[in-house]
Amino acid sequence: MNIKPKYTFDMLYVSPLTKKLGFDEQKLRIIYVSMEQKRVRTGLEVIDMVVDALMAGRDPADIPWRQGIDYAKMSATMKLLTGMTMVEMRTLWRARVAGELLRYTELPLKEVMRRCGYTSAPSFSRLVSKTYGSSPLKLRKLSREKGDMGKFAL
């Protein structure tokens, strides 16, 4: 039996980029304006706790231990509701954050790596290479389009 997940990754993902270029009220100056974050509250504590942890840059694998929940059961529940285990969700989340930060910011690689939850440069490089097909520095160069720099802010 193939059950369609109730929540997709794109429904749950929240970008670390919180501001975009826009105009002031008089339309005289270009300023950064806050972007509406599309944070979906599912009402399902298991999903909301995982998304909250990921948004805060924490590893959701710590949640079961802190909550006294069986890790395997929590991960299986995530898989049923989202089509992804907690590890798969965390990996995809980190990859998406890395892609956005590399494309739209000038943050040093070490800072991008930290914001993605990595302390190991080789592990971070493997994630980016596996996801995007190139190294972090190459991705930064190749993914940028004219006008990307300064388009968004954290």
Residues of each region from the PLM?
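Alpha-helical bundle regulatory/interaction domains
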Residues: 1-73, 79-81, 85, 100-126, ...
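Short, basic-rich loop-to-helix N-cap that marks the start of a DNA-contacting helix
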Residues: 88-92
